[in-house]
Amino acid sequence: MTKQSADSNAKSGVTSEICHWASNLATDDIPSDVLERAKYLILDGIACAWVGARVPWSEKYVQATMSFEPPGACRVIGYGQKLGPVAAAMTNSAFIQATELDDYHSEAPLHSASIVLPAVFAASEVLAEQGKTISGIDVILAAIVGFESGPRIGKAIYGSDLLNNGWHCGAVYGAPAGALATGKLLGLTPDSMEDALGIACTQACGLMSAQYGGMVKRVQHGFAARNGLLGGLLAHGGYEAMKGVLERSYGGFLKMFTKGNGREPPYKEEEVVAGLGSFWHTFTIRIKLYACCGLVHGPVEAIENLQGRYPELLNRANLSNIRHVHVQLSTASNSHCGWIPEERPISSIAGQMSVAYILAVQLVDQQCLLSQFSEFDDNLERPEVWDLARKVTSSQSEEFDQDGNCLSAGRVRIEFNDGSSITESVEKPLGVKEPMPNERILHKYRTLAGSVTDESRVKEIEDLVLGLDRLTDISPLLELLNCPVKSPLV
């Protein structure tokens, strides 16, 4: 028997193993602190969806989508409208990713909530149309399946390697995470879960050139949510796909997305199932406090630390004394964000992906929030920001590549006209060295949600999500999320 035919007849492997785990996962298998943490990650995703729903690029996406998509049964967050499941999932995902404030994983970069929540919410409304009631614990279990599977599959292909090579990695290995989360919500058997995974994986894609302009980068995790949801729904209807899609030697997911990476071995399929049930990636999903790429949070925090230490030296009135800013980054961060904008005006997304521009706005405004990247009132044309951005250079430091949790590290050196300099290093920014406390996530939720809706609705959503494990029907939650919100930028 040839190797290829043996492979094609394989009945077990990591695909089968993770599908069995996902299909059979029960609340009794999950530590109570993991169940609790999942609720806060869901709350953070909801806050990001609300604050991202009415920014200009999200409104443009909704207008375009509504022009060709018919109404459906699935709610669009913040709009009071409904679409079909696939369209609703993509739209809601675009909202969560819209402001670069949503979660990320520091070892296998992806934005979990933007994949898992839109797919799971849409799948639940499909079942509701069929007369089935979805409980809060159903949603938590499905979310945890997504939170746990995405980083594992990403680590199997060396996490940020795809990003270094120009792929939008989260849009790639987010697809199987979306399929597993959807499959869990739909109650798929392990066999059908493999079908869902196969359908999702054969669609996986995303190009990182999207960071240089336009709007499409905002919805590329939506492609993963769409692919996962579509895979789950088709499998739920009996549609079949290839089995063993992750590990197949010919045309398999792990093999195809690691070709030419120069690694030995090219991929580590054991990572797909490493520590299942004992190590919980739900606690390694990082919460953002800055509205920019998570890989440069270390340098931003370093600048913030220097501003606290040298308030007079880095006072806005004295920034013209800066001669040069150099930042050392991990390979992934430098590949992704270590570029200087060449064209003006810069787009919002490009500003949020350029370490030069990001550090310049932190120096000028002493904060790095959504308002720093607003396209209103020539905000992205400010001369003082551009003057500093052109003084920023970056290089990669192999030191930061040794630990997967240091991918967002940074060492910043600021040189002044008089020849003096100051330096600060942050290897693991806030939320990476230790998980962000739940209380800090709640504060972020209240701040973001409170900027786009009234206090009573903020409290209602908070109570429903933090009591999700006791909620017998999630319809009231989805109905509240559907209520129109305002733009955070006006």
Curated annotation (Swiss-Prot):
GO terms for molecular function: aconitate decarboxylase activity. Gene3D superfamilies: 2-methylcitrate dehydratase PrpD. It catalyses: cis-aconitate + H(+) = itaconate + CO2. A.terreus has been used for the industrial production of itaconic acid because of its high production rate. Itaconic acid is used as a monomer to form polymers that are widely used as raw materials for latex, synthetic resins, adhesives, paint, and additives for acrylic resin fibers and paper. It is also used as an acidulant and for the pH adjustment of foods. The keyword Chaperone does not apply. Keywords: Lyase, Mitochondrion. SUPFAM superfamilies: 2-methylcitrate dehydratase PrpD. It is found in: Mitochondrion. Its main location: mitochondrion. It is an enzyme of class 4 (lyase). The keyword Lyase applies. Belongs to the PrpD family. This is Cis-aconitate decarboxylase.
